[in-house]
Amino acid sequence: STAEKLSGACVPGMPNLHSHAFQRAMTGLTEIGGGTENNFWSWQKVMYDFLAALGPEDVEAIAAQLYVEMLKGGYTSVGEFHYLHHGPGGKTYSDPNEMSNRIFSAASQTGIALTHLPVLYAQGGFGGQPPLDGQKRFLHDIDSFARLVTELQARCRSLPGTETGMAFHSLRAVSPEMMSEILKFITDGPVHIHIAEQMREVTQCVEWSRQRPVEWLFEKQHIDSRWCLVHATHMTEEETSSLAKSGAVAGLCPSTEA
């Protein structure tokens, strides 16, 4: 009875379930002609260098422009996989929620529906490798991340069209112990994770755990309809079957996986 009635034929708005808004401003910076070998890892290096100069105002402006472009293209909701939390060098802002608040503001200005997904990122690689300098703006420990998510969830209650879930960047960026502790503390809302995106990641995971990424995740955690496995590109038939039976979603990203 409260739904708005529209005249004529209507097409439902599309959801964009996996956005890194700040990366929109990197367009054109990472693919070089002339036989240069480009891959995910060379792209990642450029991304680290690029974000070192971004401040809160930049992130809000970039996100607002991106969300307008999404709306023009028919996307009416977005899942923002947000891991740019801190200032240069990893210095915490006076308001630790500063960067997330900028995403909320961009969504509010443009009118797009937002599922905000603050990302836990705690290490530089499998087995607790130290983070690179370019990763320091992403980092949280268990307590600070749990506090961040709790505060953002509370704020969302007063923001129409907005909710907050959570995300783990990847198996290589979060220890098993941290993942389990956070899941005990945050028991509702969507959970997203990058997984099995690159064969190098799969190989490193096997070297670390003797299991492939999706195989490891399903053995160690209870995967259900809360979960979105982003990319999930390199899976065996057994892993694919486990995902299909779980109720979880495979989050495909056609523009980066083509």
What are these regions (language model features)?
Residues 28-113, 143-159:
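Alpha-helical scaffold segments that flank or form the walls of functional sites
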Residues 19-34, 115-125:
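Short, solvent-exposed beta-strand-terminating loops
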Residues 12-24, 190-199:
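Histidine-centered catalytic micro-motifs
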